[in-house]
Amino acid sequence: MTNGISILPHTQPVYGDAAVAAMAERVVGALGPAVVSHAIAFGELTLVVQASDIVYALTYLRDDPACAFRNFIDICGVDYPQREKRFDVVYHLLSLRHNLRIRLKVQTDEVTPVPSVIEVFPAANWYERETYDLYGILFSGHPDLRRLLTDYGFEGHPLRKDFPLTGFVEVRYDQDQARVVYEPVQLTQEFRNFDFLSPWEGTDYVLPGDEKTSA
């Protein structure tokens, strides 16, 4: 221990897939039942974690010197409307010490909050606000969970799969009123179904004599 910093004993460095596999074994063993499942793909470890254990899991990954995932990269949401718990909340971390990345996922629905991780990584503040704004995912314990990217009075959450492509409200600047106005969306034409055969792809013509070839 030097100046309060733990110094790891010198070990032979491990690189590539072997390093990821070794990290997976260590992390899964340490977190135990908090880990629902794990997988290694494209040189990165992904953990699916119980939502109630996300603060515990991130604290361990940050503080254990053998992990040292101290760079908080991002939080994002993913929407799977067909699932009962339709949302994944995905956390991305980086360890500069070990040159490794790790991804944690938790699942939730539209009404069940996920614990905020601001106490572990203060940088999560705006990421959680962005995820709430775009997906409607709630974070319990967040000090200021309000919209971040969309406009005042915005209806809905635009990255949900069931959000209409046109939105609900059009925001534009009105020259006559010299101010921004909000109006219901007015389409210049009705939606059309373009699910037909493209003229560029051609069609299957049956010409005289083709039946001999098929025979």
UniProtKB/Swiss-Prot annotation:
SUPFAM superfamilies named among the record's database cross-references: Nqo5-like
Primary role: NDH-1 shuttles electrons from NADH, via FMN and iron-sulfur (Fe-S) centers, to quinones in the respiratory chain. The immediate electron acceptor for the enzyme in this species is believed to be ubiquinone. Couples the redox reaction to proton translocation (for every two electrons transferred, four hydrogen ions are translocated across the cytoplasmic membrane), and thus conserves the redox energy in a proton gradient.
Classification via InterPro entries: NADH_DH_suC (IPR010218), NADH_quin_OxRdtase_su_C/D-like (IPR037232), NADH_UbQ_OxRdtase_30kDa_su (IPR001268), NADH_UbQ_OxRdtase_CS (IPR020396)
Species for this entry: Methylobacterium radiotolerans (strain ATCC 27329 / DSM 1819 / JCM 2831 / NBRC 15690 / NCIMB 10815 / 0-1)
Quaternary structure and interacting proteins, as annotated: NDH-1 is composed of 14 different subunits. Subunits NuoB, C, D, E, F, and G constitute the peripheral sector of the complex.
Record flagged with keyword Lipid biosynthesis: no
Keywords carried by this UniProt record: Cell inner membrane, Cell membrane, Membrane, NAD, Quinone, Translocase, Transport, Ubiquinone
Name of the featured protein: NADH-quinone oxidoreductase subunit C
Subcellular location: Cell inner membrane
The enzyme's E.C. designation: 7.1.1.-
PANTHER family: NADH DEHYDROGENASE [UBIQUINONE] IRON-SULFUR PROTEIN 3, MITOCHONDRIAL, NADH DEHYDROGENASE UBIQUINONE IRON-SULFUR PROTEIN 3
The reaction(s) this protein catalyses: a quinone + NADH + 5 H(+)(in) = a quinol + NAD(+) + 4 H(+)(out)
Pfam families: Complex1_30kDa
Superkingdom classification of source: Bacteria
Record-level Gene Ontology MF annotations: NADH dehydrogenase (ubiquinone) activity; NADH:ubiquinone reductase (non-electrogenic) activity; quinone binding
PROSITE patterns according to UniProt: COMPLEX1_30K
Underlying gene: nuoC
One GO term describing the cellular component: plasma membrane
Protein family (similarity comment): Belongs to the complex I 30 kDa subunit family.
Keyword ATP-binding annotated: no
